């Protein structure tokens, strides 16, 4: 039985990835920080078959200890401070977790595996997946973006992701490690945290439909993103580690939608006119805005056989329906 270790298992992607690996009869271990973390309790309820190990990405010895306990065949590093506005508010911590955290995981794998100058592991090779991000492209010079598109990040989060991405390449080339990065474009789900734009919109539409709120305040509606379903995207992670050779891949739908289109679809689901409820508030606009990101997933389609199954409209409907059910359950409790 294959054994996988997931950092960031309390996240949207972590839970979907764990479910996917369990369906393939993996043994799954989650690396979590803080025994009193309420998100850990949620993981225990959602994923009772997942074993949890405690540690801290800010401490190399802690990461190494977890790797020694779990002895994984595959390690998926999904941990990050991924909310862009939060990365501005806590830029140093973002660098420590999202950037240097990758270094500590790679070093833990290298030390545990006994990889040195010979580039040959003495204890078996751990295959490593790094969750890179389309935010690394930032102020794009070409569209759509491929694996060769230059990086020009415009946020602390994007900059930290570039550091982790390049480190993964460095360890692959310098030590012969099976280390890959998936450059993931925006992917959402009902499990997305409410502070993220997509969930803010779907939750807002649901609250307005149920009479909980009257207005939804948002920033620029013209910004465009390549949005997909998180449950689809985690399949690509496992496929990357199943290849004969380690390579990086862009993962996305190849189709962009504006924030206005997202809003329109969410309010269509609840049969309301968004123009009557949405207010554009300049205070929500980022210090430096990323205008348009669009994936070219040709390589992933060709080499991994990966394609998204859930379309944009279906995704937004899924999220709104989930939020309506959640709010209705809360009101009846």
Regions found by a protein language model. Name each.
Residues 23, 30-31, 55-58, 192-193, ...:
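C-terminal substrate-binding subdomain of Rossmann-fold SDR/epimerase-dehydratase oxidoreductases
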Residues 1-187, 310, 322-325, 332:
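N-terminal Rossmann-like NAD(P)+-binding domain of SDR-like oxidoreductases, especially those catalyzing
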């Amino acid at each position: 039985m294959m054994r996988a270790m997931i950092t960031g298992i309390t996240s949207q992607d972590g839970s979907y990835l764990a479910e996917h690996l369990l369906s393939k009869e993996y043994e799954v271990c989650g690396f979590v920080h803080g025994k009193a973390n309420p998100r850990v309790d949620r993981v225990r309820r959602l994923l009772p078959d997942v074993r949890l190990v405690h540690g801290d990405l800010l401490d190399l010895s802690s990461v190494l200890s977890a790797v020694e306990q779990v002895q994984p065949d595959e390690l998926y590093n999904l941990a990050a401070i991924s909310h862009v506005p939060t990365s501005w508010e806590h830029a140093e911590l973002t660098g420590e977790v999202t950037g240097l955290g990758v270094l500590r995981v790679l070093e833990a794998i290298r030390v545990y595996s006994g990889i040195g100058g010979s580039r040959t592991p003495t204890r078996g090779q751990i295959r490593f997946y790094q969750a890179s991000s389309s935010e690394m492209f930032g102020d794009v010079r070409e569209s759509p973006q491929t694996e060769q598109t230059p990086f020009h990040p415009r946020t602390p989060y994007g900059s930290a992701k570039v550091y982790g991405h390049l480190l993964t390449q460095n360890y692959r080339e310098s030590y012969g490690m099976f280390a890959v990065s998936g450059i993931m474009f925006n992917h959402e789900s009902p499990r997305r945290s409410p502070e993220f734009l997509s969930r803010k919109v779907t939750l807002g539409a649901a609250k307005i439909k149920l009479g909980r709120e009257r207005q939804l305040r948002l920033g620029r509606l013209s910004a465009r993103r390549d949005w997909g379903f998180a449950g689809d995207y985690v399949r690509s992670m496992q496929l990357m580690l199943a290849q004969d050779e380690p390579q990086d891949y862009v993962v996305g739908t190849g189709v962009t939608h504006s924030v206005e289109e997202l809003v329109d679809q969410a309010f269509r689901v609840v049969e309301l006119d968004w123009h009557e409820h949405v207010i554009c508030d300049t205070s929500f606009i980022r210090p430096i805005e990323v205008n348009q990101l669009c994936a070219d997933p040709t390589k992933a389609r060709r080499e991994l056989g990966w394609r998204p199954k859930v379309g944009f409209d279906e995704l937004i409907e899924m999220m709104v329906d989930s939020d309506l059910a959640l709010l209705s359950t809360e009101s009846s409790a």
